[in-house]
């Protein structure tokens, strides 16, 4: 996996493209994310600035309520069997539903990098752990944390 794919700017670009730009027009518009758009559109750069202001250096609890709600909904959707744990199979399904990935081993490697010993004992990732990882994905400006792997292998948007 290319390490440049996990830098903060690329991670935020991924969030815009694969999580919020519903109609894939390259913008977050009123249809996608009404509360951020002052001119009717939110570019990736504008979204990055908003994320930087609202999320960098913050915990999940400090995120704005609408973002916390969106993250919780994302987890609920990913936990397909509703057992309160995000398993490897559910993680794989989440990853391949967003983008074509040639090698499942890349997804599996990302999942293993997310897990703590406690996660392994439990058999998956809990909602609170997912929240922590998501906060790290958006809120940590470097590429050193486990959270950078939350969405599996990322494309490089550079």
Language-model segment annotations:
Residues 38-158:
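EF-hand and EF-hand-like Ca2+-sensor regions
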Residues 1-39:
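Eukaryote-specific detector of the first structured module of a protein
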